[in-house]
């Protein structure tokens, strides 16, 4: 069997452990999952009703163009339909971008240390060279990224807020970066957690910077992780290129209907943002009380430092708590849950740390 050599360098993406899997393994009755940055509120009631009303039509293919969803997004973002590409989650958008703009093994893709793992996956999958820039206090070093640009640079990926660190780049710094970045290099601002911030880097920026792509998702603040809906905001030219390689029917009909109705449910989004802010404070205070170092976050998760992170992770599993190991030494990423879930996690974490004679980090 002959395969592409670059596939040998790829480690498959490992998602957060499903609740059902832990139930099968340990037979636990109470399990909470704070591993995948999902919305603890669940799903918009408006979206649920629309989903139920649409079930009789699932024998039909979805609208491949996604007209009604694009129309709703365009109205919400105050842009044209031609500036939007819909996808099966924003992960698919990232893959489309890589496929559209990286053409040879000599091409380079720049992203930060401790960045979203999918940037590395899509770069390796197409056989390009990844240029990983050392982080600055767990955050993107934008100037170092600019310094790394050369004639082979095709794409720069910047997650803001970043996953898994939760760090946030202020709008002024993003704007300065966009002004300085070469116009023939695609700059991707991954805004999966945009709704939790007060950033003003919005769709109108694509008129100022033709090389800019904003990517967003319905999986986080909008609570539709299980349906996989993401989208890109970009110039007409970029949108045209992305749609040339986008799979037909890539966003299913239920997902489109759910996204349209969730987008219209402003109360649900407002409540999601509020509970997240309270949860961040709750977890931060809990870590302070335990004397733990954590990275201040603007997303819906916090990364906290503990001795022997994998050992703590496994012991939490046995107590019915699923969190997420990350590629930062001795860090675990904790998604914001409900108040009760956060309390339960903090109590179980304290039990584990006491048994481990944990040396608190600062």
Could you say what each language-model-derived stretch is?
Residues 124, 142-151, 164-187, 191-221:
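Active-site pre-lysine segment of PLP-dependent enzymes
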Residues 65, 211-287, 292-295:
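PLP-dependent aminotransferase class I/II
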Residues 315-319, 325-362:
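PLP-dependent enzyme catalytic core of the Aspartate aminotransferase-like
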Residues 30, 80-84, 105-108, 152, ...:
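Short acidic capping loops at alpha-helix termini that bridge into adjacent secondary structure
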Residues 277, 285-319, 336:
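Conserved PLP-binding catalytic core of the aspartate aminotransferase-like
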Residues 100-158:
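PLP-dependent aminotransferase-like
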Residues 1-60:
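N-terminal "arm"/small-domain region of PLP-dependent enzymes with the aminotransferase-like
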Residues 62-108, 126:
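Phosphate-binding glycine-rich loop
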């Amino acid at each position: 069997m002959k395969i592409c050599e670059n596939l040998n360098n790829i480690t498959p993406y490992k998602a957060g452990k499903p609740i059902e899997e832990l139930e099968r393994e340990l037979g636990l009755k109470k399990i909470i999952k704070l591993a995948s940055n999902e919305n603890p509120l669940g799903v918009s009631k408006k979206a649920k009703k629309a989903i139920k009303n649409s079930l009789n039509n699932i024998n039909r293919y979805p609208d491949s163009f996604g007209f009604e969803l694009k129309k709703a997004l365009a109205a919400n973002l105050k842009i044209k339909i031609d500036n939007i590409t819909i996808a099966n989650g924003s992960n698919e958008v990232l893959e489309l971008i890589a496929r559209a703009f990286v053409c040879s093994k000599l091409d380079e893709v720049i992203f930060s240390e401790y960045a979203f793992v999918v940037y590395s996956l899509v770069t390796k999958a197409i056989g390009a060279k990844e240029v990983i820039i050392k982080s600055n206090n767990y955050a993107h070093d934008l100037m170092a990224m600019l310094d790394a640009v050369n004639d082979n640079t095709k794409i720069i990926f910047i997650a803001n807020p970043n996953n898994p660190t939760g760090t946030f780049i202020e709008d002024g710094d993003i704007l300065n970066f966009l002004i300085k970045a070469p116009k023939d290099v695609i700059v991707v601002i991954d805004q999966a957690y945009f709704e939790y911030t007060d950033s003003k880097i919005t769709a109108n920026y694509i008129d100022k910077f033709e090389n800019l792509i904003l990517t967003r998702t319905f999986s986080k603040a909008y609570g539709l992780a299980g349906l996989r809906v993401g989208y890109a905001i970009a110039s007409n030219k970029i949108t045209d290129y992305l749609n040339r390689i986008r799979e037909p029917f890539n966003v299913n009909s239920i997902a489109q209907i759910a996204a349209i109705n969730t987008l219209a449910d402003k109360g649900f989004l407002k409540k999601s943002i509020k509970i997240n802010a309270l949860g961040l404070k709750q977890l931060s205070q809990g870590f302070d009380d335990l004397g733990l170092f954590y990275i201040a976050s603007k997303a819906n998760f916090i990364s906290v430092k503990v001795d022997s992170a994998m050992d703590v992770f496994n012991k939490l599993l046995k107590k019915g708590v699923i969190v997420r190991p990350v590629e930062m030494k001795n860090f675990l990423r904790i998604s914001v849950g409900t108040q009760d879930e956060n309390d339960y996690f903090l109590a179980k974490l304290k039990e584990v740390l006491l048994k481990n004679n944990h040396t608190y980090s600062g």
